[in-house]
Amino acid sequence: PIKSSAASDVYKRQLLTVDNGDFAAEVEEISYDQIPMLDKDSAEKLGNRKLGELADMVSQFEVAGDYTQINYKGRPVRVTPLRYGDWIKWLNNRSQGLPAYLVIDMVTQNVDVVRLDQGIRYTTAEHFGRNLNRYLRFRYPTYLFDAPAFEIDEDGNPFWVCPRIRKTIGLFGGTDIAGAVLVNAVTGECTYYDAADVPSWIDHVYPAELIIQQYDYHGTYVNGFINSLFGQRDVTVTTDGYNYLAIGDDVYMYTGITSVVSDESNIGFILSNQRTKETRFYTVAGAEEYSAMESAQGQVQQMKYAATFPLLLNIADQPTYFMALKDAAGLVKMYAMVNVSQYQIVATGSDVAECESNYRQMLARYNLIDDSDANIPADTQEAAGVLSDIRTAVIGGDSRYYLRLQGESVYYVISAADAPQVLSLIHI
């Protein structure tokens, strides 16, 4: 704990610099066909299912739980290595190494198994001298490391990015990242880079948890140590939870910022580049993430779907929470968009295109965008079939009908206010 005014000033200034930003100008507007639809849990399900389809691997290997989110050739993906099923399987296969890694496209949900000419020999799940943490300890005995991140370069070569920790305030305080050791997962070749010199294809140098800790210091001691205890003028902290946003060739961590007095609203949020730690604060008063999740769940309350932690998007220059809605089995059934500033603006859809279309129409209805910007995406598909289930709910005074067709697992949502001519047929 920090116990002096001088120490608090050092923590505020030395660890993290936060600039103000313009969300609409700096965060590129994203189209429905570019929205990452997979959270880590869904990616894990797809990865395990894919491995189960490979007869030559499923009996010997398992999918490791890394699922690092990176930008790969301009696409947001999650990558993860394999691991040995048990000790016996390790003994039988260790000479060849792990034969492949998985790449999960977060937009298309395609899973690629990338087979390697030479197997991966250095991982966090290895044993003895090839265990990555032990390997680093012998190669760099004086370094302290944070948790390594599995990444691939633009040629698909697997690496471990191992951030080097340094203490910048006294002997034990002011944790920061001095640089990173890049370990070739196949050959074990190591290269150290200072933080400013890390190759641009690397996405994870500064862990999200460290950035959050540093911002909390920054927000707590913004007006000094005494103010952090008494008065607490302008004191802010991060909200619970965070997610990632792809901007350009980099991955940014974002989290909400709220006042130190616990409430259910944000005063804004930060975006922090996980390669450079460049951090910007965006003033957008609105709902905090869990309130937005509850709003989305309220739209489909009769389905009892659970919302994933939201992704922050720019839709029509509006900061927007996007999330998947899952059933009790963890399967994605619908998608939701919630306006950050006005979280009563909630739209859902059975696919992302429908969800965005409904959301844009609601923005136009609230006069946040022009009608010309509320067009339905060109390739939105019509659904036809025999109704197998109809459910109703009244939300905000508006009757909503949830329709399911025979042979499908998703529900289509129709508002009585928006389509009375269609709903009249339902009562025939």
List where the protein language model places each region:
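Single conserved hydrophobic/aromatic residue that forms the stacking wall/gate
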Residues: 1-7, 11, 426-427
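Short beta-strand elements that form the blades of beta-propeller/WD-repeat-like
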Residues: 78-83, 159-165, 251-258, 320-326
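Structural motif
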Residues: 90, 263-270, 331-336
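Long, repeat-rich segments with strong aromatic
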Residues: 244-294, 298
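Structural detector for short beta-strands of small beta-barrel domains
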Residues: 376-397
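OB-fold (S1/OB) nucleic-acid-binding surfaces
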Residues: 397-413
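Short nucleic-acid-contacting surface segments enriched for D/E, G, S/T with interspersed K/R
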Residues: 418-426
